[in-house]
């Protein structure tokens, strides 16, 4: 406590007193901010101090301990400060679909993972991930029903924290109303650069879990692969670039592509192609007339769609006639592989996706890349997994069931 003094003490003592009082107020305000428990507005001076402290925390992007040491504060990809227990034992990953695989490889286990999205589970069951983390297939998915968050089921899982897609504001509001700590992981903060997105996901995981980034080598290698591909394309000078169409989500008569400001644009630009849907934004719905007009040279189908290349090539999809499309006539229809996770969004296999797409979009420039050997070497280096021939076949010919949808 600061002792009360008389006015006659003198200027020097008065200044000393004011400094002491300011120090006490500052310390109290910082403790209140870091504990995140000030529910009411304090006086103006204290509020200003708290605001300054929060800004400094956000700038440093580091964890801050609360006064009692049982919790810590992290700044997620929405810019929000989230108070979390230091000891996190029960984690739910909801609307950020690739993150369960990234988390499992970061932790080397699914032991603390108590809930994931059904679509994440569909991918996991048809991936190589269970070979590395067998218990991933036993994680609960019941808290999401018909794509909707069931708060009652979620509360039954007793999560210490929920990881969600930072753009899903409705989900955040439901979690906040239920008093569940929620950390937002972004997909759009880095211009849909898949390597940078992955890199920032594992960085935030490290801050939340208070652990070292175990996946830093993957991001570093991803940047290296990207730079090597750009150098090869630049050295080639003026090259003919194929017109590329990505069927991002094609099911039940609805065709959605990947336009600008989405991952497809990054993949195509990075590997020597031209996105036919570049004038569209996000994942717009398109029709066959538009596809006939574009007449793409190459078509890629993601694992969010149950359709396979042969469905287009054999023209067996009811209501859609693919027979006149150039890519179909020339047999240049490819399914994105599925390794630890679907290869279209950011994930731990991202460096391999860059190489695979480069060999398809510019086969002459990247003829020296043996993708089967690349995958074997990568899995041994980063996951310590020796892939069999059967594993390789599974990765490059993923099941339709991985989409979680029916044809």
Can you name each region flagged by the protein language model?
Residues 141-145, 151-164, 288-304:
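Proline-aspartate-enriched helix->loop->beta-strand connector
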